[in-house]
Structure formats: C-alpha cells, structure tokens
A protein has these predicted regions:
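Membrane-interfacial helix-loop segments of redox and metal-homeostasis proteins
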Residues: 1-357
Length: 357
C-alpha cells in the first residue's frame, strides 16, 4: 500500500510538472491539460461548433488515449468491454461538459488553476466536492448502470483509431479543418505538436497504471477513508505551483497570480463556479470517473467510456453553438438555465437507476 501511494504521489507530481511546462511551451495559461477545454477545441477544429476562438485539434487528447493504450497492452490490461447503459452515459457526459464549461475547466484544470493562484478554483472545488457527495448518496443506495459485456478487440480499438486519425488531420491540416487564427483566442495558443503529444503520452501511460482520477480521490475517501489518491491531487497542485513560481521568477511571465480578479480564462461568479462543478462532479461520479479517466478507459478498450467522450464532445458543441459556455465576463443566461436543467436531469438519472430506494 505504501509503495502504491508513493507511485500515485510521484505520478501526480509528474503530471503537475508537465502541465505547467506545457503552458511555458505555448498552451493557454493554467491550461496545460484540460480535458473539457481540449475536447471543446477539438470539436471546434472538426467544425462541430462555430466559436472561432476555440478551434484546434489538441494532440493531448490523442496522446492520453494512446498512452493508456500502450500501458494497457504492455501490462495485459487491454480488455474491450461495454454495453452498460450507453445512452445514459452519453447524456451524463453531455451535462458533465455543460457543467465544466460553466466553470471554464474540467476537474483537472481546477487543480491547475489553484496551482496558478486562481482562488476562484477553490470556490469551484466546494461545488465539485458537493457534487461528489451527491453522487455518493445514490451509490450508497444501490445506484448502478448495470453490468458491462465483453466486446471484440475491434470494438475496443475504435477510440484509439480515432485518436490516430485526429493526429493525422492535425498534421495534414486539410482545408475542412478549422484553426483559430493567431491572437484569436485560446485555440491559437498551443505547444508544438511533438511536445504536446509526448507529454500526453507520458500522462496517459502513468494515469493508466495508477488509475489516477479526480473523482476517485474524494469518493474513495468518503466511502473507504482511503487517502492515497488525495495525496496525488496535492502532488499535482504542489508540483504545478512550484513550476509556475519558478517560471515566473526566471522568465518574468505571468505563470502565477494569486487572487480572484483578472485570472486567465476564468470568471469570478462564485455561485455559478460552484454549481458548474457541482454538476460536473455529480455526473462524473455516476459515470465512474472524471473526464481524464474516461479518456484513459477508452484507451483500455472500454466502449462505454468512448460513448461518454462522445457525450462530452456533443456537449461542448452545444455549449458554444447555443451560448451556454461561460467566458471571462461570466456565465450566460442560457448557460445558467442549462446547468439547472442538467442538475435536474442528472438527479433523475441517479434516482431512476438506484435500486434500493
């Protein structure tokens, strides 16, 4: 157990370090790795939404999937399976993304924002924890999306093939792929493809080996008083914060800024930061893992996680096509309505799939 905890802490430190370094090499501030934002950008790059500021096929997405695939194959853990309420998972993924884009980041970016000095993310953490507690309430009463079934290797490999196709499209850059113009928004800020892909391959490999998951830390602490994953989260924040502070002192860049106001790609509306991550946390508990974990599981051959990723992508497209996503100016009225609807829908799904009412 002690060795496992050391491995998880080391993994968290490496991930935090790499995420901060990716910002140095060009990724948006406090966004070295953000699954929600990167899926949103990729959806834009494929033309699924028309928000020109956030259009770029992020190689980190492919890297996480392929890194997890490599780890699973090397350690005999590639196990294609699926068939556990896929449409329900799609809907949960959709609304988890709506919650993330209300907050402006997935649970992992929440940690990176804290490491960059953004105190709004600590406010969001309150909502995230509350959402996890809401999910645990139903888990303790028999919530289940029922069993999975063994699938073929071809089925389990589909998401990995898609990851390779996305890389080809990024490098080939055909005319039908969209890219944010320089200076046009977060989509224009990115590290070199090789740097992004290399870092993500490492993160994908490590997270597959350690089962690193933003949901598991709090969930397992509440259910089993298990703390090893929580220490992994602390390691992410500590490593990213230390790297940010060093980079700021050496380069003079704005890698660390303590406060609420004028934080990069963030807003200061506390209520909707809380509610956005409440929705994301609640939905992800019901899904069995955070967005990063879903990417890793899809690399292992889990088609249910692949369907969840499709829900994330469609949610991102809806968020930007219909004005649901927040901006630095704050949440939109449409987004607020969508989050309230999402909380109601996720609660209904939790209740209807709980069998010891």
């Amino acid at each position: 157990m002690k060795n496992e905890q050391v491995t998880i802490v080391a993994t968290g430190a490496v991930i935090g370090l790499l995420a901060a370094i990716l910002v140095f090499f060009g990724n948006p501030a406090n966004m070295g790795l953000c699954i929600a934002c990167f899926l949103r950008d990729t959806a834009g790059g494929l033309g699924l939404h028309a928000a020109k500021a956030v259009q770029y096929i992020r190689p980190e997405i492919s890297g996480l999937v392929l890194g997890a695939l490599a780890a699973a194959y090397l350690h005999g853990e590639f196990a294609p399976k699926g068939g556990s309420s896929p449409l329900t998972r799609f809907v949960l993924g959709f609304f988890a993304m709506i919650g993330c884009l209300m907050f402006l980041g997935c649970p992992f970016r929440m940690l990176l924002r804290i490491a960059g000095g953004d105190l709004n993310a600590i406010v969001g953490l309150v909502g995230f924890a509350a959402g996890i507690y809401a999910g645990i309430f139903f888990l303790n009463r028999g919530y289940s999306l029922k069993r999975t079934y063994k699938m073929t290797a071809a089925e389990g490999s589909i998401m990995s093939v898609i990851a390779v196709v996305l890389l080809v499209l990024l490098v080939a850059a055909p005319a039908f792929i969209h890219f944010t113009k320089a200076g046009g928004g977060p989509g224009a800020k990115h590290a070199a493809v090789a740097v992004s892909l290399g870092a993500a391959l490492v993160v994908g490999y490590l997270t597959q080996r350690t089962r690193f998951c933003m949901i598991a830390g709090l969930r397992d602490f509440v259910l089993f008083r298990e703390t090893k994953m929580l220490w992994g989260f602390v390691a992410v924040v500590a490593a990213a914060a230390a790297t940010n502070i060093v980079l700021a002192s050496v380069t003079g860049g704005a890698f660390f800024k303590l406060g609420f106001a004028a934080q990069p790609i963030a807003h200061t509306d506390a209520l909707w930061n809380v509610l956005g991550l409440f929705l994301a946390g609640f939905a992800c508990v019901l899904l069995g893992g955070c967005p990063m974990r879903q990417l890793v599981l899809s690399g292992e051959g889990n088609s249910d996680s692949a369907v969840t990723l499709l829900g994330f992508i469609v949610g991102a497209a809806f968020a930007h096509n219909f004005g649901l996503a927040s901006s630095g100016n704050g949440p939109t009225a449409n987004g607020q309505i969508a989050v309230v609807i999402g909380i109601a829908v996720v609660t209904a799904i939790a209740y209807l799939n709980t069998y010891k009412k």
